[in-house]
Design a protein with these regions (language model features):
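Solvent-exposed functional surfaces
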Residues: 1-169, 174
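Acidic, carboxylate-rich catalytic segments that either coordinate divalent cations
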Residues: 166-201
Length: 201
């Protein structure tokens, strides 16, 4: 039986001499490992891994979150610093601290099936929300992310209600699936709503 992908990616941080296509995944796997196991992390014990089966967040979705930022976002801009890894961890830790404050009832104690916030589609789309707040506002702090996410909150339907994706696309809170199409739609919706709110300030 082949090794499960999630286990391969979990082992990547300990493997050297990898081909280029694996290196961004290796970096993401390391960041996620640290966030999952550092006691003061806002994601401590939250990510489901072979070494942490009690976690509920998708390891793959969280790696995608990091990779989006590393490929063309905040983390990419940190690469010029010697402590870029520490900056990357701090950024994501601060963002998810804010997520847990602003969306407390949609996060605490819930599984992905009960909250799209903790679902693969929600997590990956949130990476673009973080990037928008960073690129538009220079946000890296917990307080800055809390302020930005509060603007977005009225437009979300993580656990109940409907997503008003467009005039012709309205779907129940759990009608968003973990597919590239739905992730793209949710990302576009969240970032457009946030841009509108930021302009009003």
């Amino acid at each position: 039986r082949p090794l499960p992908k999630s286990l391969i990616y979990e082992l990547l941080p300990t493997v050297d001499g990898l081909p280029e296509r694996f290196t961004s995944r290796k970096f993401a796997a390391r960041i996620i490992d640290l966030l999952n196991f550092l006691p003061n992390s806002s994601l401590f014990g939250e990510i489901k891994q072979h070494t942490n089966p009690r976690g509920v967040l998708s390891d793959m979705a969280m790696q995608k979150f990091v990779m989006n930022s590393a490929n063309d976002g905040a983390i990419r801009s940190f690469m010029k610093f010697d402590d870029f890894e520490g900056r990357s961890i701090e950024l994501i830790n601060n963002f998810f601290h804010a997520v847990r404050v602003v969306f407390k009832s949609e996060w605490e104690g819930l599984a992905p099936r009960n909250s799209r916030l903790k679902h693969g589609a929600g997590l990956v789309s949130l990476s673009f929300v973080m990037e928008l707040l960073y690129s538009d506002q220079g946000t890296t702090s917990k307080e800055g992310f809390i302020k930005g996410l509060k603007l977005l909150k009225p437009h979300t339907a993580w656990t109940s209600g409907d997503w008003h994706i467009s005039e012709t696309d309205r779907r129940p809170w759990n009608g968003i699936q973990n597919t590239p199409t739905d992730i793209g739609l949710l990302t576009k919706y969240l970032t457009e709503k946030l841009k509108q709110e930021l302009k009003r300030r």
